[in-house]
Amino acid sequence: MEAFRALLVVDAERFSAHRDVDLRTVHDEIRRAVKTACRKSGLGETWENVRFMESTGDGILAILPLEAAPALIDPFPRRLQNALAAAAPRLRARGLHLRLRAALHMGLVDDERPEAPGISTATIDVNRLLDAAPLRDVLSRSDPEVTFTAFIVSADLFAAYVAGGRTRLRESQFTRVQVRVKRFDRPAYLYVPTPSAVDEPPDAADGPEVRRPGPAGPSGGGVTLNGVTISGDGTQNAIGNIVGGDLRQERR
C-alpha cells in the first residue's frame, strides 16, 4: 500500500577511481558512516528497521518513515559530515577517499509490494536530485580535507520542514538552485554542513573523469530497479550509475 515516505540516497564522489579490490571497502565505509550518522541523529532504531534499502555499489537508497524527515534534514547532515571526517585519516592511510553527495525527498512509495517494491515517481525524482549539477559542483569545488558531504533537499521537503519551521535550520542556510536532469526541471535547496572552497577543483588540471561505458539501457530508455523497467527518456540509473537490474535489494 502506498504511503508518504522520506527518501534518502547517497552517492560517493569518484567511487570508480578506486581500485577494484578497494570498492567493497569503500562501500562498507559508506554504510558505516550512514549508520553512525543515523544513530547520532536519533534514528538508530529507524535505520535498523528500514524496510527498503538498495545497495548500489557507490551508494545507498533508503526509504524511511516520513516521521524521520525532520532529523534527516537536521542533524543528520552534520552527523554524516562528522562520521566521514573521522574516517578520513584511516582511509587516507590506505590510499582511499570518501565524500558523499546526498539527496532528500518525500513522496508516495509502496515499499512492500513484492513484485516491484520502492518503484515510484518519488524514487525517480530523488535520484534526479542526486544527479543535479549544482550538487556535484558544490562538492567538487570544496576542500576535500574539510567538506565531506553536501546535501540537496527537494522543494516539497524544504517547504514542509525548513520553511515550515519544523527543523532548527533556517532558510538562509540553504541555497536555492534549479535542477535540470532529463525531463526533471524543478527548484531544490543545497545545504553543506561544513562549507569550504578551493580555487580549482582537485584533479581539474587532468580534465574530467572518464567513465567507462555502461551496458546499454532498455529499448526506448528507462530506469531499471530490481529488474523492473520504468519508462523514461534515456538510459538513467535511478541510483547513480548505469545498471541493468543487478542492484542488491535488502528488505526487512
Regions found by a protein language model. Give the residues of each.
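Catalytic NTP-binding/metal-coordinating core of nucleotidyl cyclase/transferase enzymes
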Residues: 1-71
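Catalytic beta-strand-to-alpha-helix segment of the class III nucleotidyl cyclase homology domain
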Residues: 69-77, 81-173
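A generic structural signal for well-ordered coil/turn residues at beta-strand boundaries
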Residues: 147, 184-186, 224
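Eukaryote-biased recognition of electropositive, low-complexity segments
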Residues: 165-220
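Long, low-complexity intrinsically disordered regions enriched in small/polar
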Residues: 208-252
